[in-house]
Design a protein with these regions (language model features):
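N-terminal secretory signal peptides
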Residues: 11-62
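Hydrophobic beta-strand residues in large extracellular and virion-surface proteins
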Residues: 4, 23, 45, 97, ...
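Secondary-structure transition/turn motif
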Residues: 7-10, 49-53, 76-80, 101
């Protein structure tokens, strides 16, 4: 079964058994929520729709975006991302990973953001058997 792996430089820290997810975060300066929907494929993470509740420093709304229910909705045609690299520091706050109609902070899988480990990568992977104690599967 394909799922989502979290880690860095190919080292798997955690596995999430979902074929689709939303990555959400709050912009550090503008304090505006941003969400991106992804589909997990063998080729990588395919970005579907993205939503942002406003605009500001470094977050210009793309041409063709539609304002619906208080958020700008848009789609970009990008090749699959394998891996998707995220900056993750205590100062910037954490990301949320949403699937099965629930959102959890990445810290639920990885512990809190740390200055000594300022990045994490997400990629599509074949999930390991649940009997293996590491990496964790939730």
């Amino acid at each position: 079964m394909i799922g989502l792996c979290l880690g860095l430089a190919g080292a798997v820290w955690a596995q999430v058994p979902t074929p689709v997810f939303t990555l959400a975060w709050t912009h550090t300066i503008e304090k505006v929520r941003w969400e991106e929907d992804y589909r997990v494929t063998p080729e990588g993470l395919v970005l579907g729709e993205a939503r942002v509740k406003g605009s500001g420093a470094g977050m210009e709304i793309p041409h063709g975006a539609e304002l619906r229910e208080g958020s700008w909705h848009y789609q970009r045609q990008l090749p699959p991302l394998q891996p998707l690299r995220l900056g993750r520091t205590p100062e910037a706050g954490d990301y949320q990973l949403c699937f099965n109609q629930q959102c959890q902070w990445l810290s639920a899988w990885l512990g809190p953001p740390q200055a000594s480990q300022p990045a994490v990568e997400l990629w599509g992977c074949e999930l390991e058997v649940a009997s293996s104690p590491r990496p964790r599967t939730f």
